[in-house]
Amino acid sequence: KVQKGFDLYSAALPVGLAGFFLNATLYKTLGVVLPAAPSADTLQVASRLTVNLFCGILIGLCIVFALAMGCKPKQYWALLTAPEHVGSVSSQMGTEVFLMNVGVFGLFILAYYNLIGASFNGVTLGIIFCMLCTCNSGSHPGNVWPIMLGYVLASFLAGGLSIVAGGNFTFVINAQAIVVGLCFANGLSPITSKYGWFWGMVAAVMHYFLVTSVPNLHGGFCLY
């Protein structure tokens, strides 16, 4: 009720508030230093070819099965151009359309992370499939591309402002924190569906600037 259905990760707010309470109670109030998380540099990076082959084959099979189940291009196009957010793709448009969305959206995500030069470690691989979890809840390339664009624009904007202010800018578009942040920004796709691509992009820019500071509030007790 708080976010009115405009964030598909509906558990994020209550869990985040609980994490904020735990961080404040167990660490901040008691004056205990919160243990630092391991640096992203310590994560093992997989071969880009291996990850692309694994994801490409697995996700591509979803497209094959969707076609075998009778999914037509016009059915999937109806999802991409739906005037309202489709809250349950499988029940409203059919299981074959849902599977097609998993395949097409999955390849779309994979292409984006390749394009920005993201490191394919365990975290990155995990968030690809985390984003795919929203396929049945209505996320698809048509309402997520403005969010991706918003993140890219926000990265350049923040970098430029940092230079002017004499700051030490580290949150480039392929930084691990920003790569993960996009995963959760993906949940804002209902904003694009209802208000259009521009406001979806604006929501993504706002999310980019907030996501760098939220972990300081909940202290890592919440993965969102």
Language-model segments: residues:
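Alpha-helical multipass membrane-protein architecture
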Residues: 1-224
